[in-house]
Amino acid sequence: MSCHEALISTFSFGPRSLRSRTALLSLKAPPGMIAAYRHLAEARTWLEPMLQGKDSLLILRRIRAGLAQEIEASLRAAFAEADSRIPLDVLAVSLAGAQITLVQWWLEQRQPHTPENLAEAFQRVQRAVIRDAFGLQDA
C-alpha cells in the first residue's frame, strides 16, 4: 500500500457498511466516526505535511470521492422510498466535503475540540442537512 493509499484509508469515518436511517438521523455520532477522529488526532504530525504537499489536491479528491460514495450508498439504502429535495450525489459530496474541511480546520487549529465533541458536532450538522433534504419534521 502506498503512502497515499494509507492516508486515504485513514479518512474512512465509520464502518464501510451502510448506515441505517436511525444511525444517520441519530443525535449521537457513530463510534466509527469518533474512532477515526481519535486516529486522525494521533496521526496529525504525519498527516499535516501530506495534506499540504504537492499531491494534496489529488489525495483530498480521492478521499472526498470515497466518502461521498459511502454516504450516497447509505442514503440510498436508508431512504429508498423517500424523495430528496437535493440530488443524492450532490448531498453526498456536500457532506463529504464538509467533513473533510472540518477535519482539515481541526488539525490546522491543533484540535481545539476533542474527537468526541467534533464527531458529535458533525453528526448534528449532517443530521440537519439530511432532515432538510428529505423534508423530515421533528415528532
What are these language model-derived features?
Residues M1-R16:
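HTH DNA-binding helix-turn interface
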Residues S17-W46, S56:
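Hydrophobic alpha-helical connector segments
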Residues L18-S20, W46, G97-Q109:
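Solvent-exposed, amphipathic alpha-helical segments
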Residues A73-A77, L88-D89, W105-A139:
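C-terminal peripheral helix-coil segments that are non-catalytic and often amphipathic
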